[in-house]
Amino acid sequence: MTDTSVQSNTALDNDTTHFGFTTVAKDEKVTKVAEVFHSVAAKYDIMNDLMSGGVHRLWKRFTIDCSGARPGQRVLDLGGGTGDLTAKFSRIVGDQGHVILADINNSMLNVGRDKLRDNGIVGNVHYVQANAEELPFPDDYFDVITISFCLRNVTDKDKALRSMFRVLKPGGRLLVLEFSKPILDPLSKVYDAYSFHLLPKMGELVANDADSYRYLAESIRMHPDQATLEGMMKEAGFENTKYYNLTGGIVALHRGYKF
């Protein structure tokens, strides 16, 4: 696989960042990412199932299993979009617990709210439109924070990780589920062909939007690899960090604690 990923925010000045393979002003990236998710929100769940063959459900189940969430706890599902993880956490924490589904994109948040309410998930779930870089919550507030398939879209990942660290309770844990770098060369070649050729065509057919899914493929390539992201988490203050490669490293789950 050609390594197009100039890791994270390196090689960029303070006013620019990556939008896929393109260098843009930071404010422009925020706008462009918002446009992507406004466009795909209605078909997001369908495309997730098609793109992953349903395997995303197993990745999310593993994330839940690694969260250690218990009844009565506070959980933040950051960038939670259509609410898959929120639904599961709601059942775990119960009536005495509290789950916040937070997303910067109101279209995704509305889809998630409607889906969860249609499934009878009410009472212990609240919805907040929030920027991961400037979370509007008190210090030391959450027992568990998850951010699933979202961090790669964040403009300043280091700032977002510091913000998550601030609102996490001592003893709490952060879980970052995200596309990553395949660890097997043959898999990398197949994955490249799938991502850059088949994926945009699927987006065009199902969501009438090839460009957003082309951005998806590019954003995955520009996201920090497993070791780099672990280093960023440590730099933000997280300890006992560890990552798990899932499906040959196509996805990785990173875990870190605040002590």
UniProtKB/Swiss-Prot annotation:
InterPro entries: SAM-dependent_MTases_sf, UbiE/COQ5_MeTrFase, UbiE/COQ5_MeTrFase_CS. Its EC number is 2.1.1.163, 2.1.1.201. GO terms for biological process: aerobic respiration; menaquinone biosynthetic process; methylation. It catalyses: a 2-demethylmenaquinol + S-adenosyl-L-methionine = a menaquinol + S-adenosyl-L-homocysteine + H(+); a 2-methoxy-6-(all-trans-polyprenyl)benzene-1,4-diol + S-adenosyl-L-methionine = a 5-methoxy-2-methyl-3-(all-trans-polyprenyl)benzene-1,4-diol + S-adenosyl-L-homocysteine + H(+). Disulfide bonds: none annotated. GO terms for molecular function: 2-methoxy-6-polyprenyl-1,4-benzoquinol methyltransferase activity; demethylmenaquinone methyltransferase activity. The lineage of its organism: Bacteria, Pseudomonadati, Pseudomonadota, Gammaproteobacteria, Vibrionales. Methyltransferase required for the conversion of demethylmenaquinol (DMKH2) to menaquinol (MKH2) and the conversion of 2-polyprenyl-6-methoxy-1,4-benzoquinol (DDMQH2) to 2-polyprenyl-3-methyl-6-methoxy-1,4-benzoquinol (DMQH2). Pathway: Quinol/quinone metabolism; menaquinone biosynthesis; menaquinol from 1,4-dihydroxy-2-naphthoate: step 2/2; Cofactor biosynthesis; ubiquinone biosynthesis. Keywords: Menaquinone biosynthesis, Methyltransferase, S-adenosyl-L-methionine, Transferase, Ubiquinone biosynthesis. Pfam families: Ubie_methyltran. This is Ubiquinone/menaquinone biosynthesis C-methyltransferase UbiE. S-adenosyl-L-methionine binds at T82, D103, N131, A132, S148. It is an enzyme of class 2 (transferase). Belongs to the class I-like SAM-binding methyltransferase superfamily. MenG/UbiE family.
